[in-house]
């Protein structure tokens, strides 16, 4: 990556040809039919039982529901329907970490072993908290299947050695964000699930977002379906709460994205915590790696989004460059995050300058390109 590419990102301009001309938004102008024309063919093609799409433009929300929560019960999808949001959960974990930072309890430049003495003398003497928050620790994607307890997990971390120099490669990692959650919870002096469910989520006004779905809400928890159309549900294993464990509905998630765009104001500390997750720390070949969010200069083409969300980005280490100094949160940017579990698919985007946010939720796993393409088609219709 050369300096010219970095400059292009800094100036917020496109570095590849733009596939369409974007115009400013005058009003919320999507009809039900326009959304149907994009979502219904996708559902048919991918055999999706149920979907929700929430859109916010200039502070005005519209939520569209399709199909059923479960093929067995045939209960229609509604505002209350809960979906597994997979790795979109990682942005919540990053926000909890930046909250701890604002409280003076966490320093992102410190080594991980500074906060976890049991890891002193390990590779984590040279891994910073920021490395965990930006997928640049070198830790692998999945927790090894034989690790079932915290003691086993810590033993794994103690022995772990990176394959590449820390901070030189982006390796998308549940083990990394999981460890970020462990460090954050320790510094906040409460279990991670408690910090998320009792401290952060209520502070953001997210009343139907959970790690553990309460009994009273179980009837709204959609049944997920895998690639083979078999019913599946998330089994929360170790580091699940920190890395991919949240369930939420379209209404809560569009609120979360509106908070990210400052369309909705929350307490100053939490607004600052959310804003800090938009800091640009590393440059990949396609996007800026923020703290779990990924951002692109706006306007952005569909081809660039597909390139940045290609499978290799999650499955193989990618060379990155540290941005010095880190980029302040960019308003003229397209922020996105995918989320998946075996039976659910999520895609969330927001563009602060345009005050547009979209979240797409389905109770079947579908390929990422299909999610991005459908979302981009919605965006084109909003922006026409």
Curated annotation (Swiss-Prot):
Active site as annotated: 87, 172
Primary location group: periplasm
UniProt EC number: 3.5.2.6
Keyword presence, Hydrolase: yes
GO-annotated biological processes: antibiotic catabolic process; response to antibiotic
Any one annotated GO CC term: outer membrane-bounded periplasmic space
Signal peptide residues on this chain, from the entry's feature table: 1-29
Catalytic activity: a beta-lactam + H2O = a substituted beta-amino acid
InterPro entries according to UniProt: Bact_CellWall_Synth/Modif, Beta-lactam-related, Beta-lactam/transpept-like, Beta-lactam_class-C_AS
SUPFAM superfamilies assigned: beta-lactamase/transpeptidase-like
PROSITE patterns per the UniProt record, alphabetical: BETA_LACTAMASE_C
Binding site for substrate: 337-339
GO molecular function, one term: beta-lactamase activity
Alphabetic keyword roster: Antibiotic resistance, Hydrolase, Periplasm, Signal
Function (record text): This protein is a serine beta-lactamase with a substrate specificity for cephalosporins.
Note: The class C beta-lactamase family has a specific amino-acid numbering system known as SANC, for structural alignment-based numbering of class C beta-lactamases, or else the simpler name structural position. A multiple sequence alignment was used to derive a consensus sequence and then the consensus was numbered taking into account insertions and deletions. This allows use of identical numbers, e.g. for active site residues, despite differences in protein length.
Family stated for the protein in its record: Belongs to the class-C beta-lactamase family.
Record-given protein name: Beta-lactamase
Gene from which the chain derives: ampC
